[in-house]
Amino acid sequence: MSKRDYYDVLGVSKGASADEIKKAYRGKAKELHPDRNKDNPDAESLFKEVNEAYEVLKDAEKKAAYDRFGHAAFEGGMGGGQRPGGGFGSGDFSSAFSDVFEDLFGDFMGGQRGGGGRRAARGSDLRYNLRVTLEEAFSGLQKTINVPTAVACSSCEGTGAEGGVEPTTCPTCSGMGKVRAQQGFFTVERTCPTCSGLGQIIKNPCKSCRGQGRVEKDRALSVNIPAGVETGTRIRLAGEGEAGMRGGPPGDLYIFVEVAKHELFERDGVNLYCRVPVSMAKAALGGAIEVPTIDGGRGRVQVPAGSQSGRQMRLRSKGMPALRGGGIGDMFIELAVETPVNLTSKQKDLLREFDELSEDNNPETKSFFSSVKSFWDGMKG
């Protein structure tokens, strides 16, 4: 059977750039990989064809020879005998995709990447949920928290080895933490089964930590909570997470702040809102009222005569501080005109008398019922 054109195999034009060829190869190799096409009997042969095409087209010399002579460039010579670029069969087949292998198949290998020797395992990052009051969020505070975590073992100083004996290099992976295995036409890199990827083995594990180099323990940490935090604020404490395995670097601690609801104030960014009840008389006649402020003080505002429920007044710079500077928000007072209850007979008589005398003092009521009358008249007509 005649071979397909290599450009057609990868789905690129003859003038495609090296990056375009590489991108096309990645897509085809991922699409046709046998592990993803176990029900397709042709997957393996198609996968090999893709790798064969990429082996040629990724190499400038081989590509030039292929562009000039086609497949004949790699089939025993062109009448004179020498293969340009050494020919396809002259090298290790796995080199065809060594530069993109990890990007393509990292998901099959658990996302691990090889090379560079062993790296001590970094400790995990930790999350701590911290609930604070609105007053604490306003002023900021220093707070001590207890965090359950893994700390370096004091018995072995984090090495995991008993009696100060140093770990030895793993003989299976030579300290790389990974081993390679040939699978068909390509090389697969996996975590070393002997040392679990650490590159070292311990002949006499520490009894306190069982060779892990760390133990479980609660840590007391002093945390600075800045003024202006709000629900969702995240504070990072570098190096305060779990200790790494066998001397590896520690992870980080992330504190997620939740600001508790307040019985008097509602918060919207840097502004505060306080709903203040006022009597009918105060709303009608006007006058000064005192309101609480988040700093524990008192604010004084003037209620205009004739105020209705929902009217807002502002106290400037009595809100919350901005987290990263930039001033302080305002406090808004919303009036809630309260209707009196549990009236005495005398109070009821006075209100009836007042109602009879106040027909011209309720413009909204008068306007509403005038509109209602017009609506009903229109329905009749």
Swiss-Prot record:
Keywords: Chaperone, Cytoplasm, DNA replication, Metal-binding, Repeat, Stress response, Zinc, Zinc-finger
Binding site for Zn(2+) 2: 170, 173, 192, 195
Main localization category: cytoplasm
PROSITE patterns for the chain: DNAJ_1, DNAJ_2, ZF_CR
Coiled coil ranges: none
Cofactor field: Zn(2+)
Domain J: 5-70
GO MF assignments: ATP binding; heat shock protein binding; unfolded protein binding; zinc ion binding
Cited InterPro entries: DnaJ, DnaJ_C, DnaJ_domain, DnaJ_domain_CS, HSP40/DnaJ_pept-bd, HSP_DnaJ_Cys-rich_dom, HSP_DnaJ_Cys-rich_dom_sf, J_dom_sf
Subcellular location: Cytoplasm
Gene Ontology BP term (one): chaperone cofactor-dependent protein refolding
Entry similarity comment: Belongs to the DnaJ family.
UniProt cross-references to PANTHER family, sorted A to Z: CHAPERONE PROTEIN DNAJ, DNAJ HOMOLOG 1, MITOCHONDRIAL-RELATED
HAMAP family, alphabetized: DnaJ
Protein name: Chaperone protein DnaJ
The organism's taxonomic lineage, starting at the top: Bacteria, Pseudomonadati, Pseudomonadota, Alphaproteobacteria, Rhodobacterales
Name of the gene this protein is made from: dnaJ
